[in-house]
């Protein structure tokens, strides 16, 4: 049987993206839905790296499974890197994606410099240690939303060298160039997934 890998998310969009990218590897991905009593990890660190490591390690300790966790931030040059680590909570702790996008457009109203980048840090916590992998995708924030795919800031982000926003792209096209895709590709190139077999089997759901 393939080794199990817990993905620290209940977000179906994110899980689908990670599953598609990890499809070539002999790994059984398990979402947090398999652990309904697992508490949400408080993302209270000041960096993407800190949040990713905290989530991966806390859930690895809780479940005994190797755990993959990530944190992603949209860094806008004209806003001095904001929303950054607070991207998911840009418009408030209870804000949804639409509210975050609306606030971003308001903050950029009249701005000529609309350069931005998505940055993802993935942390993989196993019985033998913790490793981090980074992926970056540069682009611009357009002036109005386009596209119905994706999630988060995807309808506003047009990656460099492309005429479409992330939300207008087919899933496989986005996965090939996205920040999360690049971070996962770095993981795949530099990490031996066979070590996931070291996870204690009795912890599997």
Where are these regions (language model features)?
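Anionic-ligand binding patches
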Residues: 2-6, 10-205
């Amino acid at each position: 049987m393939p080794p199990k890998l817990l993905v620290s998310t209940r977000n179906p969009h994110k899980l689908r993206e990670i599953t598609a990218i990890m499809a070539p590897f002999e790994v059984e991905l398990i979402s947090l839905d398999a652990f309904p009593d697992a508490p949400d990890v408080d993302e209270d660190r000041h960096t993407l790296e800190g949040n990713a490591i905290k989530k991966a390690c806390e859930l690895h300790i809780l479940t005994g499974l190797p755990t993959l966790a990530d944190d992603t931030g949209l860094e806008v040059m004209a806003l001095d890197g904001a929303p950054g680590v607070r991207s998911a909570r840009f418009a408030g702790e209870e804000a949804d994606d639409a509210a975050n996008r609306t606030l971003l457009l308001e903050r950029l109203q009249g701005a000529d410099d609309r350069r931005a980048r998505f940055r993802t840090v993935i942390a993989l916590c196993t019985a033998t240690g913790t490793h981090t992998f980074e992926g970056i995708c540069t682009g611009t924030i357009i002036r109005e939303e386009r596209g119905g795919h994706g999630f988060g800031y995807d309808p506003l982000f047009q990656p460099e060298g492309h005429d479409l926003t992330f939300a207008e792209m087919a899933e496989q096209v986005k996965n090939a160039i996205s920040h999360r895709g690049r971070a996962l590709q770095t993981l795949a190139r530099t990490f031996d997934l066979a070590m996931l077999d070291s996870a204690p089997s009795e912890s599997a759901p």
